[in-house]
Design a protein with these regions (language model features):
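Conserved Walker A/P-loop ATP-binding site and its immediately adjacent core
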Residues: 1-31, 49-52, 208-212, 270-277
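Conserved motor-coupling elements within RecA-like helicase/translocase cores
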Residues: 31-44, 279, 286-309, 314-315, ...
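Interdomain/boundary linker segments immediately adjacent to catalytic/signaling cores
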Residues: 521-524, 528-582
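Catalytic core segments in nucleotide and nucleic-acid processing enzymes
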Residues: 274-277, 288-302, 331, 355, ...
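Conserved RecA-like P-loop NTPase helicase motor core
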Residues: 300-386, 633, 670-671
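Conserved coupling segment at the C-terminus of the helicase ATP-binding
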Residues: 63-69, 74-265, 274-280, 394, ...
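Inter-Walker segment of RecA-like/P-loop motor cores
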Residues: 14-62, 294-300
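Conserved RecA-like ASCE ATPase "motif II neighborhood" in helicase/translocase motors
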Residues: 42-74, 78-85, 182-186, 296, ...
C-alpha cells in the first residue's frame, strides 16, 4: 500500500533519506514516483506537504492521492505547523486585513477604545482585540465574502480552503501588525488521505502531556501507547534550578558561570526570543534562529567547546554527545500566535495556562541527550520560568522520567551547605558532566525500574472541547455540544479556568440561545475578570477588602510554602518594574503582584473592566491606592493627558466606592514635574525613577531579612520586618512616593 513518513521540516526530510539509504530502505520525496504508487518505496515529506489547503492528499477537486499508512515522526514538534496551516494570518498592510478590520472596527472599539486606537496606529505596545464570538457568527457570510474575493492571494491560498466553510467556529484576533483567524479545534478530517488511512502512527519522545494530539490530530484518548518497557533509554540528565535553591543568584551570575564552562564544554542556550538572545551577546556571537538553524546545528556538532544560543528552537534538532554537555533553558517560551497570547491573558493565574509551555521546556531539555549512554547537564534559569516550575509546582507536568531526574538532582543539592553559592551549585553539575561514578550509578538506578505510561495523558477538558467542536461542526448538534460544555464547567474547580471554559460554553450556547450565551458570559466574569465582557458590560467591582492584617495575610498566603518561594515570586515582580518601552502590561501586572505579596488587596480595574486605574491597592482601614503607570514615558514633563487619566481614575473611585473609603492618587513616571497645561490635584503622589529604585532595593533587603530562619513564619517578626523596610502602608507612602513639581 501507499506509505508516508512525515517529519516536521526539510532538514529532517534529508536526514531521514540519508538514514534510509544507510539501512537499504527505498524512499522517495515525490508522490508521483512509480515506486511509491506501486508500494515499493516510502514517501518522505514534511508536515506542510500533507496538511495544506491545496494538498494533493485530499484538497484537490480530482487526482487526490490516497494513503494506507501514515507515520508522523516527532509529532509534538509538528503540532504548531499543523495549527499554522489551519489558520489565516494576514499583515495589516494587506488589503484583506483592511477589509476585515473595517467589517469589525466598531465591535473592536466598543471592547476597548485605547487598545483599538493603539492597533489603528500600529503601536507595537498595543494589546490584542478579538472579535466577539456572537458578532463573528452573525457576520460569517460577510467575512467569507472577503476571503473568497482574495482566495488566490499568496498569504491565504494554502490556508483559506481548510477553514473557509467553518468561520462560525473560529476566533478572529487583531494585533498592531496582523489579523489572525483560527478555528476552535483543527478540522483534521479535511485531509482525507490522513483521516482515511488504515494505520496512523505517531512517534514522539515527549510523553508529559498528549492533550494537543487530541485537539489537533483528533486522536482517540483511549488508544494504547507502544513504548519501551523502561525509561532508562533517555540517558543521564542532571536538572538544576540555581535560582530556586538560592533566589539571590542573578541571571548575570549564571551567564558568567556558563561562560567559564564553555571553555571546556559545548554549552547550548535556548531562549524564547531575539530580544532575550541579546542578553548573551557579551559572551557569544554564535546565535542561531530559524533562518540559519541548519548551519548552526552543523557548527555546534563540529565543536567540543563554546557557548551557542538557539532562538525559540525547542524541538526538531539533535545535539548528541560532546555537541551538547550543558543545555540551558532561559526564560518562558513565547506564545506563537495572537490567539495564544490572548488565551494566556485569559488564564493569568491558572496553572492551565502554562501546560503547553512546560511541554516545550521538556522538549528543549531533550535536545542534548539522544541515547541511553549520552549525558547532559540541564540548567533552568530566568526568575519567571523558575517561579512557574518551582513555585507553581509545574514540575508535575513533566514526564515521569524527567520528574525523577529532577528529584535526584534536588536531593544532591540538599546535601550541600545551606549557603548554596553558585559555585557550590555548579559543583553539583560536575557530578554529571564529569560522569562521577557514584552519580552515574544513582542516575541509572533511578530509571532502571521506572516504566513509561501505557495510556495517553490527555486532559478531560481537551477531550470535551474537541468533542463539542466535532458535534457542532460535523453534526450540527449544538445542544449536545452545549451539554458537554456545561458538565465540564460544573466539574471544574479552578475558578480562573472555570471562567475561561464558560467563555467557550457561551460560544456554543450562542447557536442555541443568544440571550443565555450573554448570561453565561456575565456569570463567567465572577470567576475570571480577564475574559471579554458581555454586550452590556460588567458593573461589579472586585472586593479587595477581604484581607487580613498585612503580615497575617502574607503568612496565610504562604502557610504551606517556604520563604524561597515567596522570594522567587517577589523577584519576578520587582525585576519587571522598570522604565522601558513596550513593557506597560508586564509592569502593571507586576505592580499588582507586588501589592499582593506585600499583603494588600490588589487588582487591575482598567484591564478587568476597561475603566478605572491601571492598579488598585487596598492597604487596610478603608484606604486605597489609585495608581496610574506611565513606565514607558520618556518625556521630561508629565503631560496633560497623563494627568487627566489619574484625575479620571480618582473620579471612578469616588463613583464606585462608599464615601467612607479614601484613596491616595499615585502616578508612576520617570519625572515628577507636570506640564504647565496639566492640572494635578493637591493630593497626587509621585513615584519617579529614584523612588522606584529605592523601593526595589529595600524590597530586596526585606527578602534577605526574612530569609533568616524563623522570621517568615512568625507573624510578629514579619510585621516588624515590614516596618523596618517601610513596607507598611504609612511607610510606603512616606518613603517611596514624593511630591510633584509644577511648571510655572
Amino acid at each position: 500500500g501507499h506509505a508516508a513518513y512525515v517529519v516536521p521540516d526539510n532538514y529532517l526530510v534529508n536526514q531521514v533519506i540519508e538514514e534510509a539509504k544507510d539501512l537499504g530502505i527505498d524512499v522517495t520525496t515525490s508522490e508521483k514516483d512509480v515506486s511509491f504508487l506501486d508500494g515499493s518505496s516510502i514517501l518522505v515529506i514534511n508536515i506542510q506537504k500533507l496538511f495544506n489547503g491545496l494538498s494533493i492528499f485530499g484538497m484537490r477537486s480530482w487526482g487526490n492521492v490516497t494513503l494506507d499508512y501514515v507515520l508522523i515522526d516527532d509529532v509534538h514538534a509538528c503540532v504548531d505547523d499543523v495549527k499554522t496551516q489551519f489558520s489565516i494570518r494576514v499583515d495589516n498592510e494587506n488589503a484583506i486585513a483592511k477589509e476585515i478590520f473595517n467589517l469589525y472596527k466598531d465591535d473592536l472599539k466598543a471592547q476597548n477604545e485605547k487598545n483599538f486606537l493603539d492597533i489603528c496606529s500600529g503601536d507595537p505596545k498595543s494589546g490584542y482585540l478579538s472579535v466577539p464570538f456572537w458578532r463573528l457568527q452573525e457576520t460569517k457570510s460577510e467575512l467569507l465574502a472577503i476571503l473568497q474575493k482574495y482566495k488566490n492571494d499568496p498569504g491565504i491560498k494554502f490556508n483559506y480552503p481548510l477553514i473557509g466553510d467553518i468561520l462560525q467556529f473560529c476566533n478572529c484576533t487583531f494585533t498592531h501588525n496582523s489579523v489572525e483567524i483560527e478555528p476552535y479545534a483543527i478540522p483534521i478530517s479535511k485531509i482525507m488521505a490522513f483521516a482515511n488511512a488504515q494505520r496512523r502512527i505517531f512517534m514522539s519522545a515527549t510523553l508529559c502531556d498528549d492533550s494537543q494530539l487530541t485537539s489537533v490530530f483528533d486522536i482517540d484518548e483511549n488508544i494504547e501507547i507502544i513504548s519501551p518497557k523502561l525509561a532508562a533509554d533517555i540517558g543521564d540528565r542532571m536538572i538544576l534550578f540555581p535560582q530556586a535553591y538560592t533566589p539571590q543568584i542573578t541571571d548575570q551570575d549564571i551567564k558568567n558561570k556558563l561562560a567559564e564552562y564553555a571553555n571546556d564544554y559545548n554549552v547550548v542556550v535556548i531562549v524564547p526570543s531575539k530580544n532575550r538572545a541579546n542578553f548573551w551577546n557579551d559572551v557569544t556571537s554564535e546565535i542561531y534562529s530559524a533562518i540559519n538553524i541548519v548551519d548552526g546545528v552543523k557548527k555546534i556538532r563540529s565543536q567540543k567547546h563554546g557557548l551557542y544560543v538557539l532562538v525559540n528552537k525547542y524541538d526538531g534538532i539533535d545535539l548528541p554527545n560532546d555537541s551538547c554537555r550543558i543545555i540551558v533553558l532561559d526564560g518562558i517560551p513565547d506564545a506563537r500566535t495572537a490567539l495564544e497570547r490572548l488565551r494566556e491573558n485569559y488564564l493569568q493565574g491558572s496553572i492551565n495556562g502554562i501546560k503547553e509551555k512546560i511541554q516545550k521546556i521538556e522538549q528543549g531539555m531533550g535536545r542534548g541527550v539522544r541515547s541511553t549512554n549520552d549525558y547532559c547537564g540541564v540548567i533552568i534559569m530566568g526568575a519567571a520560568l523558575v517561579q512557574i516550575l518551582y513555585s507553581q509546582k509545574a514540575v508535575s507536568f513533566f514526564s515521569v522520567a524527567t520528574r525523577k531526574q529532577y528529584g535526584d538532582a534536588s536531593q544532591m543539592n540538599k546535601k550541600l551547605d545551606t549557603a548554596k553559592s553558585i559555585d557550590e551549585i555548579f559543583s553539583t553539575l560536575d557530578y554529571c558532566i564529569k560522569q562521577d561514578k557514584n552519580w552515574v550509578q544513582i542516575s541509572r538506578n533511578a530509571l532502571s525500574n521506572l516504566g513509561y505510561e501505557k495510556e495517553l495523558k490527555v486532559e478531560k477538558a481537551t477531550v470535551v472541547l474537541r468533542k463539542a467542536f466535532d458535534y457542532s461542526m460535523l453534526k450540527g448538534n449544538y445542544v449536545k455540544a452545549l451539554e458537554l460544555m456545561r458538565n465540564l464547567v460544573n466539574e471544574t474547580k479552578d475558578p480562573i479556568y472555570k471562567g475561561f471554559l464558560m467563555l467557550e460554553e457561551a460560544k456554543y450556547c450562542q447557536f442555541v440561545n443568544p440571550t443565555d450565551a450573554q448570561r453565561i458570559l456575565a456569570a463567567a466574569q465572577e470567576y475570571n475578570h480577564h475574559i471579554p465582557n458581555p454586550i452590556d458590560g460588567i458593573k461589579t467591582i472586585d472586593d479587595l477588602k477581604k484581607i487580613k492584617a498585612q503580615a497575617q495575610q502574607i503568612a496565610d498566603m504562604y502557610a504551606d510554602k517556604d520563604v524561597n518561594e515567596y522570594i522567587l515570586n517577589m523577584n519576578v515582580a520587582i525585576d519587571s518594574l522598570v522604565f522601558a518601552p513596550s513593557s506597560y502590561r508586564v509592569f502593571e501586572k507586576s505592580l499588582m503582584q507586588l501589592g499582593k505579596l506585600l499583603g494588600w488587596g490588589s487588582s487591575r480595574p482598567d484591564e478587568m473592566y476597561n475603566i478605572g486605574p491601571d492598579v488598585l491597592w487596598y492597604v487596610g482601614n478603608l484606604k486605597y491606592a489609585v495608581i496610574e503607570c506611565k513606565n514607558e514615558a520618556t518625556s521630561e514633563k508629565i503631560s496633560k493627558d497623563n494627568c487627566e487619566q489619574l484625575l479620571s481614575s480618582v473620579s471612578w473611585f469616588k463613583n464606585n466606592f462608599p464615601s467612607d473609603c479614601s484613596c491616595i492618587p499615585i502616578m508612576i513616571h520617570p519625572s515628577v514635574k507636570f506640564d504647565k497645561h496639566a492640572s494635578p490635584a493637591e493630593d497626587f503622589r509621585m513615584i519617579d525613577t529614584a523612588m522606584l529604585n529605592r523601593l526595589k532595593e529595600n524590597v530586596r533587603k526585606f527578602c534577605i531579612a526574612i530569609s533568616v530562619s524563623g522570621v517568615f513564619k512568625n507573624v510578629s517578626a514579619l510585621s516588624d520586618t515590614l516596618d523596618t523596610f517601610n513596607l507598611t502602608p504609612n511607610g510606603f507612602f512616606k518613603s517611596y512616593t514624593t511630591d510633584y513639581l509644577y511648571e510655572i
